[in-house]
Amino acid sequence: MAHATHASITFDEGPHLAIGYATLRTGDFRLQPVHIHPPLANVLAAAPLLLQSDLPDPRAVDGWEIASLSAITDAVVWQYPHPARMATAGRVPMLLLSVLLGALIYRWAKDLGGWRAGLLALTLFTFDPNCIAHGSLITTDMPAVFFMVATMYAASGEWRMASGEWRMANGKWRMANGEWRMAAVGVLLGVAQLAKVSALMLVPVVGVLLLIQGLANEELRITNCESRITNHASRITIHVLRTWAVVFGIAALVVWAGYGFEISAVPGGPFPLPAGTHARIFQSLREHYELGHPTFLMGRVSNHGWWWYFPVAFVLKTPLPILFLGFWAVLRLMLECWNAGMLKRLNVKAFERANVQTLACRTLPGLSLFLFPVLYALSSLFSTVNIGYRHLLPLLPFLYVGLGVWSTKYGVGSRNGEWQMANDKWQMTNGELRITHHASRITHHASRIPPYSLLLTPYSLLLTSYSLLLLWLIIGTLAVSPHFLTFFNEIAGGARGGYRYLVDSNLDWGQNLWDLRAWMDAHGEDHVYYAHYSPARLDVYGINADFLPPDPRAVAFAPWNPAPGLYAIGATVLQGPYAPDVNTYAWFRGREPLTRLGNALWLYRVPPRETPTWAVLCAGVSFSSDTVAQRLGGGDLRVLWPDCAHTSVYPPGQQPGVLIASPDTAVPPRAEVDVTLRSAGGETESVVYRLSGSAPTPETPLSAVEVDGPLDFLGYTLHAETVTPGDAILLETYWRVRDVPGRPLSLLAHLLGPDGSAVAVGDGLGFPIEQWQPGDVIVQRHSLAVPVDARPGTYTVITGAYWLDTMERWTITDATGQTGDTIRLYRFERRE
């Protein structure tokens, strides 16, 4: 209940409430195909809203005629002045269904393994933070899970009267339940279809279970402990077909009743269909899968997801104690099979000798428990809509029941698993494991453990281990309260580290508006810039905010130079999904937040700073001048395009600028990383550096040198002290633009050998003269490769400039008044 009363209305809850209320108020299902969900969960959640007299009539909302879901949701939910009242009212039915689901999990596990199994399964469900979070929110998830589990429980045959079970009686396998149970299966199957479209996967699974039950329910004659089928295949076929007709016929009728027995047209269909809205929902779902859905996984952003999304989500969002129990169960089962020799003894002949009915009876409980979750898990690998761990919720009840039953039968609390003292040896009572499978019988005696200490008995160790795991689960869940939605296990770094791996409904669903208001009140803040994909209206929460992209109400925003103020940014848009592009909030992504509200809403304080007036775009950067100007806040921005690998440019004045380059581009030493931009695949694509207004000073200034040309020579920096054959001498020459020339030119850099000839040449100019302005400082980087066969002697580094069209060098006058066409910068002595 803590999560239900603490969380603000989340992204999906608004449409669910609005559609449910509109359906109940009008009896019209026009919004269901738009939302791509059947109506059951919506109307269950919205039923309490019928008691609210201050909600508008959906038919009076502008947009009703065109089935505008956003307009109806805004009018019914987001503008409602009492969001806490609406959220609590809508979440109560979801909480009740969660309680019923817990009871169902307990009952199923108890039927299979006794009350200890039921209690363990219920404990795992009760303290799973994911179930707590989604079980208290208005979505289709928990209703769908409940009716899926209820359908499978009924179809399994475990739903029985006190005497009802699969057993041998009068030489026949009989199930105590009658045809009424088949009708109940049909009703539950139909209701599940009305809860969520993914419940369609129940249909083939239920069909298989009914087929197996049909095989198991046929009359058999018992001879020499082996069963033989006496009825003809036709009788089995008729029985199964009759059962299918009853169950699926009732399910179809329930679905039709759920839509008010409507008969409506389906786009592309030749004639109207019963429950045509349901068919249109599947058409919308197909379009949705084709278009994809924004999603994030470990730094990557995609609209069509990855096959490994849900496996990663399961590993990172499932509590580690549950993962350990599951791993231990699988490992123990494999060891049991290996020790018993099952893998060696089962063969084709055993299958041939096995009785079909015996097989059916013995495999039915396991298939009932694991067939659906296995198929569901496999289907998730092919999903192109990867929006959250919540789509794995249907797996969890089956996992809990399985762990509860396994743990009590082969772990703690089982009559087959209790260790007792016998003949001065620790021995497992009833340790004989009999597995009869296809007429094969395997007997496995329990291992015997020396009596070192009562506390070190296998049973005591198991009991202690289970107790510690459950304690770990409970403490870990309570530690994240009331922010259960943001739970991540220790592999992901806990709730505070989960944003690096998964977002959206895994972490940030717009649930922290009450936290934001409380923080602003506590710190005396009266305004915030708010960035989130939820269309919530913050004024109904008492928050004065300006919205940022992707909200259609967004104010002007400069992603690389945000205005000063307080910013609240959801972890989802921070990582890229739903935002205009993956780097909309990259400026914030590279900075530590002021605080994190509920692990999902990040607060930043942006201080005032000067707006850049110039930008340098290096090769490999795909931004246009207009794009750069917009992301820096507009205004009069000068954009330069030098060859950044060899040239740096600094406009005159003291105004700051930025340099945008690929991550492997060499940048000036004083450049500070301001924004790191990444691709949709997660790799660093380019980096925005912030540069101070003044140009750097050369290590060796030579301002007294006069150059007969449009440039003034300022000095140089030499990154070498010796001449080493095979190495390169790195030289930086500094020039200031005096005038803009009308002809091409180049800057000279030579290494002269002992005889005065050039042994290395590094001429070049990486800044087109078309972009020059008087006062620009050009830093040209030259590389002079020393020959590997360089002779001993004196080597001289010189520089200068010349016109490219005539190759005429400029006249240069040094400080002594001597003239020439080069400037001697440095001399090296190369000795033997």
Per-segment meaning from a language model:
Residues 58-73, 105-127, 180, 184, ...:
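Transmembrane-helix signature of polytopic, membrane-embedded enzymes
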Residues 154-160, 178-180, 188-189, 202-249, ...:
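Perimembrane helix-loop-helix junctions
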Residues 313, 318-347, 352-355:
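Hydrophobic, aromatic-rich transmembrane alpha-helices
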Residues 204, 244-249, 366-374, 407-417, ...:
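Signature aromatic-anchored transmembrane alpha helix within multi-pass, membrane-resident enzymes
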Residues 25, 29-93, 266-304:
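Interfacial juxtamembrane loops and adjacent helix segments
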Residues 340, 411, 417, 453, ...:
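C-terminal luminal/periplasmic domains and tails of membrane-associated envelope-modifying transferases
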Residues 92-112, 150:
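Transmembrane-helix motifs of polytopic, lipid-linked glycan transferases
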Residues 121-126, 153, 189, 193:
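Short helix- or helix-capping micro-motifs
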